[in-house]
Amino acid sequence: MSIAIGTDIVEIARIAEVLERQGERFTDRILSPSEKLQYQNHSDGIAFVAKRFAAKEAIAKALGTGIGHGVSFQDMVIGNDEKGAPFAELSNGAAEVMQARGGKKMLISLADERHYAMAYAVLT
C-alpha cells in the first residue's frame, strides 16, 4: 500500500553551475561518503549528482517534510542493485519520519535525459 509520493525534476545545467561555483562544498552537502566515491569515478558525474539531488528532494517530499525540517540530504543514500535498479536507504531523521508515517520502505525511480534529471519516490 502506498502512503505518499514525491517527485522532483532538476535542470542538469543548474547542477553543473552549482558544482562549478561550490565544488566539494556542494557534493559534501548532497552526497553520502559512498555516493561521493561513486561520483568521483562516474563517467558522467554531473548527471550522477543531478539524479541524487532529485531523488533526495523527491524522498523528502514523499516524507512530507522537505529538506531541512528534521531530514537532511545525508539521511538518504541512493544506490543501485546488481541489475542497476535504484534503491534508497534512509537513516536518522528520514528513517524516523518514515516510521512515524507508518512507512516501511521508500521506492524510487530515476531518469535523466540531455537537459533534465527526475526522480519519483513512493513511501510504502
Show the residue positions of the predicted features.
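Core catalytic alpha/beta fold that binds nucleotide/phospho-ligands
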Residues: M1-T124
